[in-house]
Regions:
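Accessible peptide chain termini
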Residues: 1, 251-254
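Gly/Gly-Pro- and Ser/Thr-rich, intrinsically disordered tail segments characteristic of DNA damage-repair
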Residues: 1-117, 241
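Alpha-helical structural motif
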Residues: 3-6, 10, 19, 38, ...
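Glycine-centered secondary-structure boundary/capping sites
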Residues: 20, 48, 131-134, 183
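Basic, nucleic-acid-binding surfaces and adjacent catalytic neighborhoods in DNA/RNA-processing proteins
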Residues: 22-42, 55, 60, 147-252
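Phosphate/anion-contacting hairpin/loop surfaces
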Residues: 71-169, 174-181, 189, 243
Length: 254
């Protein structure tokens, strides 16, 4: 599943390409991803909408429309967007076509159909946003507030970092990388992690995520950018999926 750096990479690509575009029409080949309303009302809502911006919240893509309204997309395992100048017969995993007034085509594809799309007259009405924890780059994510939350739990530190209600955007890849850089055992109880260690964890979280965003995310299996290119951060992973390989610090096999 795309994590924060992958979603941020996609969002930046879409925002750059789609800002100011207008959705002219839709073709829906499979309606499973539409989780609010029926395909007809989904299409009716979107047709004629001008895209003001594309932003990210946690692992979600937020399409903002002018003057109001928005669409929330969760790519989950295999969802992706691509842009094309030409219209060819739909591929086997293409689920929705968004025809743009410029003549370009925005394609939503999803091999496993776990991704979701939902529209709202106001993104303030998006209920899932209220369940999300702070963004890693926000001031609300800090060692003291994190310690308070960890002390309330009996869980291990890694599952806590994966909890989207505690911290938005992290997944297995980046939680593993952050804990490795901090020297914190992922099986350690969260409430046993000291304040000084949490200060380092906050810093390393931001550092790892920034590095991954600069490398356009991690492409291990399905992740592709809007231009279909892969990310590069998989070449810089220090611990994730490196079992049996020498540790980058000690040369002992992981």
């Amino acid at each position: 599943m795309p994590e924060l750096p992958e979603v941020e990479t996609i969002v930046r690509g879409l925002d750059r390409e789609l800002r100011g575009e207008t959705i002219d029409s839709l073709e829906i080949f499979r309606s499973d991803p539409i989780i609010q309303g029926d395909p007809e009302s989904f299409s009716e809502f979107l047709c004629g909408r001008k895209i003001k911006a594309v932003q990210r919240r946690a692992k979600f893509l937020l399409f903002h429309f002018e003057p109001v309204g928005g669409m929330v997309v969760h790519l989950r395992m295999t969802g992706k967007f691509t842009l094309t100048e030409t219209k060819e017969p739909p591929g086997p995993h293409e689920r929705i076509w968004f025809q743009l007034k410029s003549g370009r085509l925005l394609i939503y594809s999803d091999l496993r159909c776990f991704g979701t799309l939902e529209c709202h007259e106001s993104l303030d009405a998006w209920e899932d946003s209220k369940k999300l924890g702070p963004e890693p780059f926000s001031q609300d994510f800090n060692a003291k507030s994190l310690r308070k939350r960890l002390r309330e739990s009996h869980r291990e530190v890694k599952p806590l970092l994966l909890d989207q209600g505690l911290l938005a955007g992290l997944g297995n890849i980046y939680a593993s990388e952050v804990l490795f850089r901090c020297g914190i055992n992922p099986c350690r109880k969260g409430k046993r992690v000291k304040l000084k260690e949490l200060e380092k964890l906050v810093d390393e979280t931001r550092s790892v995520l920034n590095e991954a965003i600069e490398k356009n995310g991690t492409s291990i299996s399905d992740f592709r950018r809007v231009d279909e290119k892969t990310g590069e951060f998989q070449n810089f992973l220090r611990v994730y999926e490196r079992e049996g390989k020498p540790c980058v610090l000690s040369l002992i096999h992981i």
